């Protein structure tokens, strides 16, 4: 089985080096400054539009980071991964671009749009009953078929990939007083927060989780990785069944605070992003916005705040249903 690297930490040289290598494979996604975002007048909001990334989310960065590091034998054997949807899409996309066979394990409740994207990109899809069963299945595939396991939110290569997002964002945006970033298993936040603190130690890093899937909150409270039981949230792509040591440690080191948002706040933020920015987002993508206009509104008033829009792998019917239109 793949041994996750728990000793190496991303530094600016490694992050910049990977950014250069990824240029032909992933997009440099734009930022958009909005000084008249209606619910937070006087706050300058810098939106990072990672929802325009190849494969629809930030996950492509970690996927390419892992796959580009494989040797010829590993490429020939193929890759596997486990995901509620977006990581599987990212791995399937990267594997297609690099000519590597992919078998992805997804939870059976995954969005049909995400399952269809994986198949469109040429991956074999295996559906599992729940998150823990999915992890058990992917480790069996890894062991029996010799495929390389691309972890969805842990390990040096995955986190180095997401660190390129933070590096790119601050280069584009310039000085920010704070950044707000969604958290599921912690891989996105581990990378982004590492890059932000290396480049701008004074910038406040705030993580956001759904109330019904707060694995990192629980990890911070207990002082280490946790396993989750039953979870409930419309932000299905943030419902990690557990946290892992590597990504937890980086979040613990670099994240200044965590907040939670409710499903109703997510729905309101989705509508807000559609009404004011004309963006159709999945619930996970709206978490940072929900926090900005909710619990963080007074604290961040008058400041320049970065808001990460991390992905939008949804479909029209699901989007309409969340907004009460379907």
Swiss-Prot record:
<dbReference type="InterPro" id="IPR036052">
    <property type="entry name" value="TrpB-like_PALP_sf"/>
</dbReference>
<protein>
    <recommendedName>
        <fullName>Phenylserine dehydratase</fullName>
        <ecNumber>4.2.1.-</ecNumber>
    </recommendedName>
</protein>
<dbReference type="InterPro" id="IPR001926">
    <property type="entry name" value="TrpB-like_PALP"/>
</dbReference>
<dbReference type="GO" id="GO:0016829">
    <property type="term" value="F:lyase activity"/>
</dbReference>
<dbReference type="GO" id="GO:0009097">
    <property type="term" value="P:isoleucine biosynthetic process"/>
</dbReference>
<keyword id="KW-0456">Lyase</keyword>
<dbReference type="GO" id="GO:0006567">
    <property type="term" value="P:threonine catabolic process"/>
</dbReference>
<dbReference type="GO" id="GO:0003941">
    <property type="term" value="F:L-serine ammonia-lyase activity"/>
</dbReference>
<dbReference type="InterPro" id="IPR050147">
    <property type="entry name" value="Ser/Thr_Dehydratase"/>
</dbReference>
<dbReference type="GO" id="GO:0006565">
    <property type="term" value="P:L-serine catabolic process"/>
</dbReference>
<dbReference type="Pfam" id="PF00291">
    <property type="entry name" value="PALP"/>
</dbReference>
<comment type="subunit">
    <text>Monomer.</text>
</comment>
<keyword id="KW-0663">Pyridoxal phosphate</keyword>
<dbReference type="GO" id="GO:0004794">
    <property type="term" value="F:threonine deaminase activity"/>
</dbReference>
